[in-house]
Amino acid sequence: MAFDYPQAGFHFLVVFELFPQFPNDIRFQEITGLTVSTQFEPWAEGGENRFTHQLPKQLQFTDLVLKRGKFMGSGILHWARKAVENFEFKPTNLLISLLNEDHLPLYNWYVVNAVPKSLAISGINAMTGQVVVESLTLTYQYFKYYDPASIALDAAAGLSASVNISL
């Protein structure tokens, strides 16, 4: 069964909502930064000196870093270069999908309004013969997480809420 064990993170793809794209534009070797945290604001209650309440203030999303071997011809690289070289920023959305053994999405992260923040190329060294790796750092507004179980739970919660209202 696909859900009997934690999923391996080596089979994934990234799809940008950009045109043009090339076959290599979905291929990355590493993705980091799909992190969200809640910022809290302390609030002191009058007459209560033992503690302060921590009220949720806003969500903070970390930068997304995409790494891959350097390819010739990339619509993603063209988009990023226009931003960092010409200061032409065009926000775009992207979908990151973790795939199963049949190449079907198991988990999805939809990243909204991403723009390039930095573009870096790994060191080039004639003595090592390593693959040249490009790193693209994106800043974005937020991401949404989708998987079959959470979609089913959201749908069930919506159905039960409507049943409770109709009773």
Predicted regions: what they are:
Residues 1-167:
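Glycine-rich, low-complexity intrinsically disordered segments
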